[in-house]
Swiss-Prot record:
An annotated Gene Ontology molecular function: glycolipid transfer activity
UniProt signal peptide: 1-28
GO cellular component: cell outer membrane; outer membrane-bounded periplasmic space
Provenance organism: Rhizobium meliloti (strain 1021)
GO biological process, one term: lipopolysaccharide transport
Protein name in the entry: Uncharacterized protein R00383
Keywords: Signal
Amino acid sequence: MSVKPAALFRISAALAVAGLGASLIASAALAQATSSRMQGLQLSNDQPIQIESDKLEIKDPESKAIFTGNVKVVQGTTTLQAGNMTVFYKAGGGSVTSGNADIDRIEVSNKVFLSSGAQQATGESGIVNLTNQTIVLKGKKVVLSEGKNVFVGCQLNVQMDTGEAQLDACGGRVQIQLDPQSRKTN
C-alpha cells in the first residue's frame, strides 16, 4: 500500500506531540513534590519529521496505522524510539491514505525512549491522547533525567495543555536524585 506524503505529515504531526512530550520531562520544580507544573510543550511546525520502522501497516477499516520494529521518530533534537507504535485516528475523520486522518491517540510499547535536548524519559509503554491532551508513560521503572538529575517512578502523567505533571510510585516511593551543580546561579 502506498502512503501519500500528506498522510505521513498528519501522522508525523501527531507523533511530534508524542516525541516532544519528552520536553515535558522533569525540571527542578518536580523535586518539590510528585505533582508539579512542567515545561510547556513546544511543537515545531517548520522542522521536518522523520519516521522509521521495520514495517508499516495501515488498517483504514480499523482506523489505525501500525509501526512495528525499531520505531524511531525524529524532529530536530527530539527523538522517540519504541519497539511498536500504533496511531489511532477517529472513524469518519478521514483515512491515513487520503492524508486527512484526525488522530485520536498514539500508543507506544516495548522499551519506550523519549529524548529532547538534555532531557530523557524511559518506560515500558506510553499513550499520547490528543483528544484530552494527555501523555502517560508507564513501566516497572519510569526514569526521567536531565543531566545528573534523575526522577524514578512507575507512571508519569502529563496534561499537555497546562503543563501539569505527576510522577507516581505505584505502591512504592518516588525516588529523586538532584545534582547541586545543576542549579542556576543569578
